[in-house]
Amino acid sequence: MVLSPADKTNIKSTWDKIGGHAGDYGGEALDRTFQSFPTTKTYFPHFDLSPGSAQVKAHGKKVADALTTAVAHLDDLPGALSALSDLHAYKLRVDPVNFKLLSHCLLVTLACHHPTEFTPAVHASLDKFFTAVSTVLTSKYR
């Protein structure tokens, strides 16, 4: 999926507004994913999966940090996320559908926290971005 110049502007602008809250939003989105799609919990049998747990927050921060890296490398997502793609494909063996579920929950979380900024254009740009990230993360499954 190709991100247009307008998409890139929307993504970077939104990520700048998120600022220091990215880790919190990542944890909240992960909580939302576990609550809405319980099958996603199977990858975290060693975690305390109760809402707001320290382990979920810490992993949510890892997700947010990876997305921050992706935002900084919009023109080379495969290069920026190659190691993460290897990890999820070869070691963790995460079912690719879970990236789509988490992406949806990330969109919902961002919309809840930034309703004014979450215009249809921003929504579409972020959806394309999360789809592009998901595509990269699942590219080594083949």
From Swiss-Prot:
<feature type="modified residue" description="Phosphothreonine">
    <location>
        <position position="135"/>
    </location>
</feature>
<comment type="subunit">
    <text>Heterotetramer of two alpha chains and two beta chains.</text>
</comment>
<comment type="function">
    <text>Involved in oxygen transport from the lung to the various peripheral tissues.</text>
</comment>
<protein>
    <recommendedName>
        <fullName>Hemoglobin subunit alpha</fullName>
    </recommendedName>
</protein>
<dbReference type="GO" id="GO:0072562">
    <property type="term" value="C:blood microparticle"/>
</dbReference>
<keyword id="KW-0813">Transport</keyword>
<dbReference type="InterPro" id="IPR012292">
    <property type="entry name" value="Globin/Proto"/>
</dbReference>
<keyword id="KW-0479">Metal-binding</keyword>
<feature type="modified residue" description="Phosphoserine">
    <location>
        <position position="50"/>
    </location>
</feature>
<feature type="modified residue" description="Phosphoserine">
    <location>
        <position position="103"/>
    </location>
</feature>
<dbReference type="GO" id="GO:0042744">
    <property type="term" value="P:hydrogen peroxide catabolic process"/>
</dbReference>
<feature type="modified residue" description="Phosphoserine">
    <location>
        <position position="4"/>
    </location>
</feature>
<feature type="binding site" description="proximal binding residue">
    <location>
        <position position="88"/>
    </location>
    <ligand>
        <name>heme b</name>
    </ligand>
</feature>
<dbReference type="GO" id="GO:0020037">
    <property type="term" value="F:heme binding"/>
</dbReference>
<feature type="modified residue" description="N6-succinyllysine">
    <location>
        <position position="8"/>
    </location>
</feature>
<feature type="binding site">
    <location>
        <position position="59"/>
    </location>
    <ligand>
        <name>O2</name>
    </ligand>
</feature>
<dbReference type="InterPro" id="IPR050056">
    <property type="entry name" value="Hemoglobin_oxygen_transport"/>
</dbReference>
<dbReference type="GO" id="GO:0005506">
    <property type="term" value="F:iron ion binding"/>
</dbReference>
<feature type="domain" description="Globin">
    <location>
        <begin position="2"/>
        <end position="142"/>
    </location>
</feature>
<feature type="modified residue" description="Phosphothreonine">
    <location>
        <position position="138"/>
    </location>
</feature>
<keyword id="KW-0349">Heme</keyword>
<keyword id="KW-0007">Acetylation</keyword>
<dbReference type="InterPro" id="IPR009050">
    <property type="entry name" value="Globin-like_sf"/>
</dbReference>
<feature type="modified residue" description="N6-acetyllysine; alternate">
    <location>
        <position position="17"/>
    </location>
</feature>
<feature type="modified residue" description="Phosphoserine">
    <location>
        <position position="125"/>
    </location>
</feature>
<keyword id="KW-0597">Phosphoprotein</keyword>
<feature type="modified residue" description="Phosphoserine">
    <location>
        <position position="139"/>
    </location>
</feature>
<dbReference type="InterPro" id="IPR002339">
    <property type="entry name" value="Hemoglobin_pi"/>
</dbReference>
<feature type="modified residue" description="N6-succinyllysine; alternate">
    <location>
        <position position="17"/>
    </location>
</feature>
<dbReference type="InterPro" id="IPR000971">
    <property type="entry name" value="Globin"/>
</dbReference>
<dbReference type="GO" id="GO:0043177">
    <property type="term" value="F:organic acid binding"/>
</dbReference>
<keyword id="KW-0561">Oxygen transport</keyword>
<dbReference type="GO" id="GO:0019825">
    <property type="term" value="F:oxygen binding"/>
</dbReference>
<comment type="similarity">
    <text>Belongs to the globin family.</text>
</comment>
<keyword id="KW-0408">Iron</keyword>
<dbReference type="GO" id="GO:0031838">
    <property type="term" value="C:haptoglobin-hemoglobin complex"/>
</dbReference>
<feature type="modified residue" description="Phosphothreonine">
    <location>
        <position position="9"/>
    </location>
</feature>
<feature type="modified residue" description="Phosphothreonine">
    <location>
        <position position="109"/>
    </location>
</feature>
<feature type="modified residue" description="Phosphotyrosine">
    <location>
        <position position="25"/>
    </location>
</feature>
<dbReference type="GO" id="GO:0031720">
    <property type="term" value="F:haptoglobin binding"/>
</dbReference>
<dbReference type="InterPro" id="IPR002338">
    <property type="entry name" value="Hemoglobin_a-typ"/>
</dbReference>
<dbReference type="GO" id="GO:0005344">
    <property type="term" value="F:oxygen carrier activity"/>
</dbReference>
